[in-house]
């Protein structure tokens, strides 16, 4: 079996990594940066260290801080207009998945005709575009190092998933010092997103030895450190360990692919503007229990990675404990038990079925689902 690993050219980790990145970019003399971020992060002062470092090197930038959760094509077009009007030369994304995905889509438009959603699917971005630096503030989406971007087509009410090595950031930055003020609810949701990445990658039909190693270590780290990061956001060690865990999960799914959890989670996220990590967390134990008969031994290893003592257990029994461990972690960090608590009703489900089955994440799932089975999975998730 052949496989591909596509990663950022440079990855910087640890407290102070933002300063290291600015020193590096200063030597490259890329020109003027468009900083793509969320206005709330600016108000919280999380970008202050970036602004200070850029000014110290006399590096020009233009701030675009209009990003909102679940970015749309209209937002991407607005960001690209800001890039053009300010005569920028490269992009710095600062934030979680939404700012980084927005920046990736703007990067596409710097070298390819729009809209960015035209590149939904795998390997459709012909030209790489301008350099992109991605500074991650959550642990997380791993958007700072993956080939994925998710942009909503508002007219169709669908999340378009763009998967292409040409949108991988040139420089990925995981500086835990800017993660300390992230609220507990966001920490929980993004942490469960990272767990979903790791579990889906490990049981994916595209899994291979390199992704297996990364996925299992990611599961171990996230299970151990996510509750600590949720309980005390200023626990720097917990933030750093979660940053490592989510990055390893990104390395795994960036090559192995994802599965039905993401395929189904994209739909309520698009129609109800729900947090992506929460959608994943609600669906993860339900869909992996559906997948479990097709990957019993792998789910037994997931249980071990999540700290379950499987000594004396059969793989069948251990695989069931993996699902229980996922449920326990999700409840421990305060994830809602179902979509009905978030305003979703049975009437919403029918419009999601075909879109979920057509999602680019679905083909890597270890078990094929019919339309009726997808409906039942959604109903169970209510």
Could you say what each language-model-derived stretch is?
Residues 42-115, 123, 228-239:
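N-terminal small/polar loop signature for handling phosphorylated ligands or for N-terminal nucleophile
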Residues 184-248, 252:
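C-terminal and late-domain segments of enzyme folds
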Residues 111-207, 298-305:
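A glycine/threonine-rich phosphate-anchoring loop and its flanking beta-alpha core
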Residues 140, 247-280, 359-363:
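Glycine-rich phosphate/pyrophosphate-binding beta-alpha loops
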Residues 271-348:
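Gly/Pro-rich interdomain helix-loop hinge
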Residues 1-64, 381:
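An N-terminal, well-structured beta->alpha segment
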Residues 345-382:
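Short, amphipathic C-terminal "tail helix"
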């Amino acid at each position: 079996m052949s496989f591909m690993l596509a990663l950022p050219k440079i990855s910087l980790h640890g407290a102070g990594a933002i300063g290291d990145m600015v020193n590096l970019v200063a030597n490259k003399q890329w020109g003027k940066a468009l900083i793509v971020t969320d206005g709330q992060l600016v108000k919280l002062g999380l970008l202050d260290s970036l602004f200070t470092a850029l000014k110290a090197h006399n590096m020009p930038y233009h701030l675009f801080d209009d990003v909102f959760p679940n970015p749309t094509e209209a937002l991407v077009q607005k960001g690209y207009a800001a890039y053009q009007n300010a005569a920028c030369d490269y992009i710095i994304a600062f934030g979680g998945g939404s700012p980084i995905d927005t920046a990736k889509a703007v990067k596409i438009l710097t070298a390819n005709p729009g809209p960015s959603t035209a590149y939904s699917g795998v390997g459709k971005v012909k030209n790489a575009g301008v350099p992109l630096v991605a500074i991650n503030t959550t642990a997380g989406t791993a958007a700072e190092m993956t080939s994925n971007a998710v942009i909503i087509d508002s007219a169709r009410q669908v999340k378009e998933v763009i998967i292409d090595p040409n949108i991988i950031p040139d420089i990925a930055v995981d500086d835990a010092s800017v993660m300390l003020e992230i609220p507990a609810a966001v920490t929980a949701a993004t942490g469960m997103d990272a767990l979903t990445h790791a579990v889906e990658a490990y049981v994916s039909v595209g899994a291979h030895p390199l992704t297996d190693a990364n996925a299992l270590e990611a599961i171990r780290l996230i299970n151990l450190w996510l509750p600590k990061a949720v309980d005390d956001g200023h626990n720097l060690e917990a933030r750093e360990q979660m940053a490592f865990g989510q990055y390893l999960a990104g390395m795994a799914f960036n090559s192995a692919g994802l599965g039905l959890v993401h395929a189904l989670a994209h739909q309520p996220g698009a129609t109800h503007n729900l947090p992506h990590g929460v959608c994943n967390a609600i669906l993860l134990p339900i869909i992996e229990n559906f997948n479990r008969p097709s990957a019993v031994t792998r789910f037994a290893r997931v249980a071990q990675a999540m700290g379950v003592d499987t000594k004396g257990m059969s793989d069948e029994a251990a695989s069931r404990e993996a699902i229980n461990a996922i449920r326990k972690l999700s409840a421990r960090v305060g994830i809602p038990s179902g979509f009905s608590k978030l305003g979703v009703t049975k009437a919403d489900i029918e419009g999601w079925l075909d879109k979920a089955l057509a999602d680019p994440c679905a083909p890597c799932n270890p078990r094929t689902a019919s339309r009726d089975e997808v409906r039942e999975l959604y109903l169970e998730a209510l």
